[in-house]
């Protein structure tokens, strides 16, 4: 055995004391918590209320899990509905099998419902969460390592992944596509954070950049995989999906930048207001002083930008005058 190879785990179950937890589920749970935690920090830094990201996630996550599983079952229906297969296995989500495309689409529906209930803009919420989702995917991909699934073509490279003999798999060393995608997602998260700082992305453009960045990587990584998949014109279905979604994301970024340049100012209806905001005091009688102080108190934990920094010159001047008073 080459010690440079990446070994596969002997079991896909993590023992948490008396509680057995499948590694796949564990990675997803950790990823969700990291995404919500980091998204909350970005949301608060932009003027939102702490806890809002988690409240919306309560809707988005279940919708996302259902959508991700549906996409997987529909696109790989032969695994569950062919002769000799048990259709009940389609409900065993803990054994692996989530399609990111369905998860994002259905998760967006759940988030939209929650955002409407809270009276906040969905694009702004998505922008705050975007890099956290990429990090969550980077963590979640390690669930494939636990399950010894979705690996690439055979290779003898030093970082090859050792796969043991098992149902529907042949022992050998393969490209660790789970690791490639995990590292790619970390890169996408850093790209979104940098671009958000550099270009003040708003109105859903940070989220669209995450989608485009992920699709660019998923296309070539998907091409390396050897698991069974449907093909269209010689390409795997997920490669075509990545191409189409990538184009849509880029088009959205371009059109959105022309129609709604800059970044929206996030103020939640139920956000804790300062006394100046509540009674409308301030130099211009509209509570600008209270808003300016609240915005100045919150800065993006990574970009160090003030949430109201890209407001109009008129508002900036009014806030400055109020501060001097």
From Swiss-Prot:
Q: Where is this region: Disordered?
A: 266-325
Record's Gene Ontology CC terms? Answer: plasma membrane
- PROSITE patterns (alphabetical): LGT
- Does the keyword section mention NADP? no
EC nos:
2.5.1.145
In this chain, composition skew of type Basic and acidic residues spans 266-312
Q: Where in the cell is it found?
A: Cell membrane
Extract the GO molecular function terms from the UniProt entry. phosphatidylglycerol-prolipoprotein diacylglyceryl transferase activity
Q: What class of enzyme is it?
A: transferase
Tell me which Pfam families the record gives: LGT
Transmembrane region positions?
19-39, 47-67, 93-113, 119-139, 175-195, 207-225, 237-257
Membrane topology per the record?
Multi-pass membrane protein
**Primary location class:** membrane
Q: Does the keyword Hydrolase apply?
A: no
Concerning InterPro entries, the annotation shows: Lgt
Q: Which PANTHER family match?
A: PHOSPHATIDYLGLYCEROL--PROLIPOPROTEIN DIACYLGLYCERYL TRANSFERASE, PROLIPOPROTEIN DIACYLGLYCERYL TRANSFERASE
Family, as annotated: Belongs to the Lgt family.
What the protein does comes down to: Catalyzes the transfer of the diacylglyceryl group from phosphatidylglycerol to the sulfhydryl group of the N-terminal cysteine of a prolipoprotein, the first step in the formation of mature lipoproteins.
**Protein name, entry field:** Phosphatidylglycerol--prolipoprotein diacylglyceryl transferase
Lineage of producing organism:
Bacteria, Bacillati, Actinomycetota, Actinomycetes, Kitasatosporales
Gene it is expressed from: lgt
């Amino acid at each position: 055995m080459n010690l440079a190879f990446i070994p596969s785990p002997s079991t896909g179950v993590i023992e948490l004391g008396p509680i057995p937890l499948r590694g796949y589920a564990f990675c997803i749970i950790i990823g969700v918590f990291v995404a919500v935690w980091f998204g909350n920090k970005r949301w608060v830094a932009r003027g939102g209320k702490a806890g809002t990201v988690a409240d919306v996630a309560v809707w988005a996550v279940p919708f996302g899990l259902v959508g991700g599983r549906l996409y997987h079952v529909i696109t790989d229906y032969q695994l569950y509905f062919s002769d000799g297969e048990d259709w009940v296995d389609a409900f065993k989500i803990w054994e692996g099998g989530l399609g990111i495309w369905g998860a994002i689409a259905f998760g967006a529906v759940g988030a939209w419902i929650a955002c409407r209930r809270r009276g906040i803009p969905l694009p702004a919420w998505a922008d705050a969460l975007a890099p956290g989702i990429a990090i969550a995917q980077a963590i979640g991909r390690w669930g494939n390592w636990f399950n010894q699934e979705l690996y690439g073509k055979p290779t003898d490279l030093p970082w090859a992944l050792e796969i043991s003999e098992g149902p529907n798999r042949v022992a050998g060393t393969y490209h660790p596509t789970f690791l490639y995608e995990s590292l790619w997602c970390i890169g996408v998260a850093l790209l979104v954070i940098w671009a958000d700082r550099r270009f003040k992305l708003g109105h859903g453009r940070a989220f669209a950049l995450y989608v485009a960045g992920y699709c660019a990587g998923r296309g070539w990584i998907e091409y390396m995989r050897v698991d069974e998949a449907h093909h269209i014109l010689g390409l795997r279905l997920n490669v075509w999906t990545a191409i189409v979604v990538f184009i849509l994301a880029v088009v959205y970024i371009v059109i959105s930048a022309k129609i709604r340049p800059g970044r929206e100012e996030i103020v939640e209806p139920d956000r804790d207001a300062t006394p100046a905001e509540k009674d409308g005091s301030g130099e211009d009688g509209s509570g600008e002083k209270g808003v300016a102080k609240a915005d100045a108190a919150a800065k993006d934990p990574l970009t160090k930008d003030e949430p109201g920094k890209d407001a109009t010159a008129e508002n900036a001047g009014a806030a400055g005058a109020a501060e001097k008073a």
